[in-house]
């Protein structure tokens, strides 16, 4: 690729593929991998620009309202309710995971999944030293196990009923603190 193009190295190529996959444009990602250029390249470039603009807008909305964001230097709690939804939350998570500012933090993100449930996503970032599986197991003991989904060693999702939210938030902070202490 051209050294000045937006696919100039493997990192930028991976970012473009990630954008395509997050937007569920697998055909576009495959075409790029197979070497198609021209209109495919323009479509990918437009998608990346749209993605970047969306992430900037979401970030500024979330972090402008101080009550939505709490950071104790080890864990970041973000209330994305009303801003993030199931369509854009995974792109936002990908952005947070790659952010240098959060590279050593456990990220706890809350969105409204439906009228009855919140989705609480916990992400262990690159330099965070906490046993996320241990947290998932403790949550499963307190709340209904069927609502805890281990995505991988670095990400879990919990569906919490609206009526159990306050109880869950109180317990999740205690569980995280306990897990940090037990690892020390």
Describe the function of each predicted region.
Residues 1-132, 137-183:
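Hydrophobic helix-and-loop "lid/oligomerization" segment in the mid-to-C-terminal part
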């Amino acid at each position: 690729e051209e050294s000045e193009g937006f696919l100039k190295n493997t990192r930028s190529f991976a970012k473009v593929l990630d954008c395509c996959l997050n937007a569920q444009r697998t055909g576009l990602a495959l075409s790029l991998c197979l070497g198609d250029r021209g209109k495919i390249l323009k479509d990918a470039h437009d998608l990346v620009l749209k993605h970047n603009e969306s992430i900037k807008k979401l970030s500024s909305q979330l972090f402008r309202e101080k009550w939505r964001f709490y950071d104790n230097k080890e864990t970041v709690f973000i209330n994305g309710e009303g801003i993030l939804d199931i369509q854009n939350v995974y792109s936002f998570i990908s952005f947070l995971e790659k952010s240098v500012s959060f590279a050593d933090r456990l990220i706890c993100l809350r969105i409204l999944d439906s009228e009855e449930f919140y989705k609480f996503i916990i992400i262990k970032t690159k330099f965070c030293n906490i046993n996320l599986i241990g947290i998932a197991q403790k949550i499963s003991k307190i709340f209904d196990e069927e609502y805890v989904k281990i995505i991988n060693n670095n990400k879990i999702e919990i569906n919490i009923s609206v009526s159990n939210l306050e109880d869950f938030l109180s317990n999740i902070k205690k569980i995280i603190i306990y897990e940090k202490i037990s690892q020390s």
